[in-house]
Amino acid sequence: MAAPVAAATARRGAPLLWRVEWYGRRSHLFGTVHLPLDLDAALGEEGRAALADAKRVFLEIDTSPDAALTFLLQALHRARLPENESLHALLRPTAWTRLTTATKGFLPPELLDRLEPWFVALTVVHLAVPPGRPVPGIRPGTLPLDQQIGERARAHGIPIEGLESILDHLQVLSRMPRKEGVEMVEEALANPAANRDALATLVGAYIAEDDRPLLKAFGQLARRKPALAERLLYRRNQAWCERLMLWLRDGRMFVAAGAAHMFGDRGLVTLLRERGYLVERVRPTAASPSTSVRTRG
């Protein structure tokens, strides 16, 4: 894979925020993490102003309470294994034992046994993470960044659009090959403490506005699990870019999506540049001018 274009000139201390311009009409692109962090700090001064002034906000999916309930109900419907299959039979015995131990008191084994591996990987295995020092920057009781953005937009009467529908989002998850889902569950259960430490590293990097650990994690995913990266990132980036083309030329759009969607030669930053948009990383005022590409086309 080519070096991540979006960070080719990245310096420490810049938020994951880009200006997106079309002949003087400016919008903003913001890379999030789906975790409860300080939104104002993550956005920086220009990001806060851009969100407050936006004509329309785009999130990966609609995060309104009604949409969240719809998502949960549809996810649960898709999460049930066929009657002749069981999670117990799909996992290695050691993984099943670790999983049932971790979920004791939260989820009965007979219910757990009926769940698809992809659903367990995304919603259940975090229970296996052993207690430890709280991850610095995580704010228990706070909404994830993208949901905070949605709440703020709704409070100011700013229309919100999903980059994809709830159905599209669920299909990305539920169409994960069974083998891939099993591998994700077993990998997460193999060393939960290491997963906690890795999360702490990424959260710390995001808060410190240090791209390097984030880019490293992105590169590892792209190299080690190319099929997952294709389905989870690249195909969605392409679809989202086509959707955004209908709006960005009007200016004052605020687009927030997971940070990994910004990076690489198939990330949103590069895709928009290839379509003629001027895309510049927002730098602190004291920083030297950006050296990003300024030509269209």
Where are these regions (language model features)?
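C-terminal soluble interaction/assembly domains
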Residues: 230-297
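Compositionally biased, proline/threonine/alanine/serine-rich low-complexity intrinsically disordered stretches
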Residues: 1-11, 171, 179, 204, ...
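Structured, acidic catalytic/metal-binding patches in enzyme active sites
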Residues: 6-9, 14-232
